[in-house]
Structure formats: structure tokens, C-alpha cells
UniProtKB/Swiss-Prot annotation:
Pfam families the UniProt entry points to: PMP22_Claudin
Name of the gene this protein is made from: NKG7
PANTHER family for the chain: EPITHELIAL MEMBRANE PROTEIN-RELATED, PROTEIN NKG7
Source organism per UniProt: Bos taurus
Segments crossing the lipid bilayer: 9-29, 61-81, 92-112, 133-153
InterPro entries documented for this protein: PMP-22/EMP/MP20-like (IPR050579), PMP22/EMP/MP20/Claudin (IPR004031)
Identification of the protein by name: Protein NKG7
Family: Belongs to the PMP-22/EMP/MP20 family.
GO biological process entries: CD4-positive, alpha-beta T cell activation; defense response to protozoan; granzyme-mediated programmed cell death signaling pathway; inflammatory response; killing of cells of another organism; natural killer cell degranulation; natural killer cell mediated cytotoxicity; natural killer cell mediated cytotoxicity directed against tumor cell target
Length: 165
């Protein structure tokens, strides 16, 4: 197995796992004040009636990125097993899906970052982004690496010549 394909499979798997952890945890934003601390994520608790629009946008694009990541990983796995894939098709599909996942995450993370950054601050409360948020950005970088490495795997794949057909 080529090094680009192996590394693409590794980055795709790591990106997918880190995104699933980021999306499923409630430590995107944290706040500390005198005598209390709080944290929140993408999924509202039962006592919250309305959810801001930017949260819905972030949820939707993160779910899309998970789907793109699943497809990318699946095609990379299938490309490693010759009986399951058409020759040379797995890495190119994984390239498109990796970049689609990265683009979806860039939209989701940018919307969340801008909206949270522009919220009014209370001088007695220290608010900051937490580890789930940063894991979302790490997933974005991993999906970009997946796309690039899959493209490298596609470009270096040996294709039969015309005479072999």
C-alpha cells in the first residue's frame, strides 16, 4: 500500500473520530464567574426552549462533514482491498469527500466562531472557547490533509497502459 494512501486513511480516520467527539460533547464554550462555572455545546439541554440560528447552522454543517468523512474513509478502506474497489477510483472519491468535509467544517466553525465572538461580554464573567471547539478545528485540518493525501495517492496510482487493455 502506498504511503499517501496509508496516511490519507490515517488522517481520515483521525479526522472522523475527532469530529464525532467534538460534535457529541458539550464543551464548545465555557464561562467562569464568581462562584460558578458553566459550559455549553451544540446540543441544547432539555430546559432550553429556543436555539439560536447559528447553532442550527453549525449542527447541520458538522453533520454534513461527518457524512463526507464517513464516505471518504469508506472509499479509502475499499481502495486498499482490490476486490472491493474499481482500480484508481477510491482515492479520487476520497479526495472530493475529504475536501467537501473540510469545506463543511470551515463553514460550521467560522459561523460558530464569529457568532460567539460577537456576543456581548459580562465584565465579571470570563468566557472562552473550550476543547470541543478546538477539536472541531483540528478535524478541519485533518480533513484537508485527507483530501491532499488522497489526491497524492490518486496521482501516484499505477494505471494499466493502453496495450494492457
Amino acid at each position: 500500500m502506498e504511503p499517501c494512501r496509508s496516511l490519507a486513511l490515517l488522517t481520515s480516520s483521525l479526522g472522523l473520530v475527532s469530529l464525532l467527539v467534538a460534535v457529541s460533547t458539550n464543551f464548545w464554550f465555557a464561562a467562569r464567574g464568581p462562584g460558578f462555572s458553566s459550559h455549553s455545546g451544540l446540543w441544547p439541554s432539555k430546559d432550553q426552549v429556543s436555539v439560536a440560528g447559528y447553532i442550527h447552522v453549525t449542527q447541520s454543517f458538522c453533520i454534513l462533514a461527518v457524512l463526507w468523512g464517513l464516505i471518504s474513509t469508506a472509499f479509502l478502506v475499499m481502495s486498499c482491498i482490490p476486490s472491493l474497489s474499481a482500480p484508481g477510483r477510491g482515492p479520487i472519491v476520497s479526495t472530493f469527500m475529504g475536501f467537501a468535509g473540510a469545506l463543511s467544517l470551515i463553514v460550521a466553525m467560522t459561523v460558530y466562531t464569529i457568532e460567539r465572538w460577537n456576543q456581548p461580554a459580562n465584565p465579571q464573567v470570563q468566557s472562552f472557547f473550550s476543547w470541543s471547539f478546538y477539536l472541531g478545528w483540528v478535524s478541519t485540518l485533518l480533513f484537508l490533509c485527507t483530501g491532499g493525501l488522497s489526491l497524492g495517492a490518486h496521482c501516484t496510482t499505477h494505471r494499466p497502459d493502453y496495450e494492457a487493455v
